[in-house]
Amino acid sequence: MTVQLALVPILLLGTAAVMVHCMPFSSSQRNDTLERRWETLFSRSMARIPGEKKDMSRESDYLLGIKRLRRLYCNVGIGFHIQVLPDGRINGMHNENRYSLLEISPVEVGVVSLYGIKSAMFVAMNAKGKLYGSRYFNEECKFKETLLPNNYNAYESRKYPGMYIALGKNGRTKKGNRVSPTMTLTHFLPRI
């Protein structure tokens, strides 16, 4: 019985090879046609829009459009996961909970938004460096994500450069203008 099941894929591949070989194109035309078909299929699947071709280049962000569900862990004090509460407060909690699950979505090359799934709020930073939860996406919700040498990430406000997301050793947020990326309280490990 298993021998018969193993023969089915071999027969299908053989049939496909014969069909391709019998096409009325020369070798170079066949390769060009297959290459164009593959490029079109690949670009359509990347764009996720049937029939629309998307230009792929080396400069394009490989994470553009990929949303990641993660918990951001800061190894300061006893270790905290950043959480977004329904009332808009943001702080750190030692144990994982439903408010610490974030959707990290790219909005530009190297720039992400952090969205609290349960609270339905974006992480945002105001001009004074204070973190808050925003119901609506705006410029204060954009953060530059930087991979650090220790494999942690730092999140710098896009609107207010030099201000970073940070948690203190007690789990409370620190003002973004009082910290730097060299401080461990700005280092976050995205965890599944």
UniProtKB/Swiss-Prot annotation:
SMART domains per UniProt: FGF
Family statement: Belongs to the heparin-binding growth factors family.
Domain of life: Eukaryota
InterPro entries for the chain: Fibroblast_GF_fam, IL1/FGF
Swiss-Prot/TrEMBL keywords: Developmental protein, Differentiation, Growth factor, Mitogen, Secreted, Signal
Gene Ontology BP, a term: positive regulation of cell population proliferation
Induction record: By derriere.
Function: Plays an important role in the regulation of embryonic development, cell proliferation, and cell differentiation. Good candidate for an inducing factor with possible roles both in mesoderm induction at the blastula stage and in the formation of the anteroposterior axis at the gastrula stage.
GO molecular function, one term: fibroblast growth factor receptor binding
Name assigned to this protein: Fibroblast growth factor 4B
Gene Ontology, cellular component aspect: cytoplasm; extracellular space
Endpoints of the signal sequence: 1-22
Record field: transmembrane: none
Localization per Swiss-Prot or TrEMBL: Secreted
Predominant cellular place of this UniProt entry's protein: secreted
Name of a matching Pfam family: FGF
